Regions:
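Cytosolic regulatory regions of ion transport systems
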Residues: 1-117
Length: 117
């Protein structure tokens, strides 16, 4: 990501990037979250696995174990207040689609989703 910012002629310090929620802390989600953190972006990491949440806790701004297929869980976390959410649930396509649908219903403005079928 830093290379992209340099290519645009901007420094990381000159760009105010709002916090990002990353849902799914597997290989892709955790790598993406680490890269965002390395570039000064605050990251809330959410995963259904408490083990993954514990493993990522030292590296992210905040981590939470939650079932994101449950719209009430997303509401309780205040996810609708964040501008950008990345859905990185790769191994369960149905969960990824349901989570993305819940985010749309909550009015999240910018949703990026990755899924493997």
């Amino acid at each position: 990501m830093a290379n992209i910012l340099k290519a645009l002629g901007r420094s990381r310090a000159g760009i105010d990037i709002p916090p990002v929620v990353v849902i799914g802390l597997g290989r892709f989600g955790s790598s993406l979250a680490h890269e965002l953190m390395a570039n000064g972006v605050e990251v809330l990491g959410i995963d259904s696995s408490e083990k993954r949440v514990r493993e990522e806790a030292p590296y992210l701004t905040e981590t939470i174990a939650a079932d994101t297929t449950d719209p009430e869980a997303l509401r309780q976390l205040g996810v609708e207040e964040v501008e950008r959410v990345i859905v990185a649930i790769g191994s369960h396509l149905e969960d990824s689609i349901l989570t993305a649908s819940n985010l749309v219903e909550l009015g999240v403005k910018d949703i990026w989703a990755k899924a493997d079928s």
